[in-house]
Amino acid sequence: MTSTNEDIISSLYPPPPPYFKYFTEQNLNNLEIWKNKAQDEMQIDKTDLEQVKEDQDIKPPGELKFLVPPKQPDADHYRGFGNLWSFEDKLPGLKESGWTQLYKDDDELITSNTKIDELHKLMDSLLLNFLELIGVVSIDPQQFHYKIEDLKLILININHILNTYRPHQSRESLIMLLRKQIDMKRNEISEIDKTSEDIKSKILKLVDTSYIGDQEDAKCDNDSTEDEESIKNNIIQKLLNQNV
């Protein structure tokens, strides 16, 4: 029954805590009034008052105590959603997790070359234990679970060493993502520059064509004006000749 309850706690998203209903505008105003009153009575500044609150030496009365954030637990772990969580975000060691560590070096001191050597050793041990498992099953099948546990321990050690590469993998993934974004931005900039140059060239062609057309129109106008002047002169000359 206890195991079933723990599974339910771990699997289901819990409802909000019952004290969420105390977070009202009126209670928030009352909390500010209480802080100011406590500050005046104790003759301390606001920083000291907050420090006193963190030390849990004084608490607001009634419902107001739920509005003050709780103090961080003194332990290294806390329970949330049915599981234990560590305050320090780091990969727990095999010994801390209750498993036997098959290599000697510490996770924080082990070098990359040593990790590679240890992985090769563990892979050799994994293959050897698998062959031993086949031999045990062929001779005494009831003893197979011992070798299964050995294989499980080796695989857990391999998985733990691989997990130590997670920070490096995260950095490399971030670098690849940033490089990809930079390349995309550069391609976009080059496309914009190319489009801008095409538009500029088209505008220049339009301007040149319009200028040439204006020049031709002006030339035609000049030619027609000259023809009209010559016709007028010819008519005037004929009239003068007739009068003579």
UniProtKB/Swiss-Prot annotation:
One GO molecular-function entry: transcription coactivator activity
InterPro entries: Med7/Med21-like, Mediatior_Med7, Mediatior_Med7_sf
GO biological process: negative regulation of transcription by RNA polymerase II; positive regulation of transcription elongation by RNA polymerase II; positive regulation of transcription initiation by RNA polymerase II; RNA polymerase II preinitiation complex assembly
Keyword Kinase on entry: no
Pfam families attached to this UniProt entry: Med7 (PF05983)
Disulfide bond annotation, renumbered to this chain: none
Entry superkingdom: Eukaryota
SUPFAM superfamilies: Mediator hinge subcomplex-like (SSF140718)
A single GO cellular-component term on record: mediator complex
Stated role: Component of the Mediator complex, a coactivator involved in the regulated transcription of nearly all RNA polymerase II-dependent genes. Mediator functions as a bridge to convey information from gene-specific regulatory proteins to the basal RNA polymerase II transcription machinery. Mediator is recruited to promoters by direct interactions with regulatory proteins and serves as a scaffold for the assembly of a functional preinitiation complex with RNA polymerase II and the general transcription factors.
Family (UniProt): Belongs to the Mediator complex subunit 7 family.
PANTHER family (alphabetical): MEDIATOR OF RNA POLYMERASE II TRANSCRIPTION SUBUNIT 7
Annotated protein name in UniProt: Mediator of RNA polymerase II transcription subunit 7
Source organism of the structure: Debaryomyces hansenii (strain ATCC 36239 / CBS 767 / BCRC 21394 / JCM 1990 / NBRC 0083 / IGC 2968) (Yeast)
Annotated gene: MED7
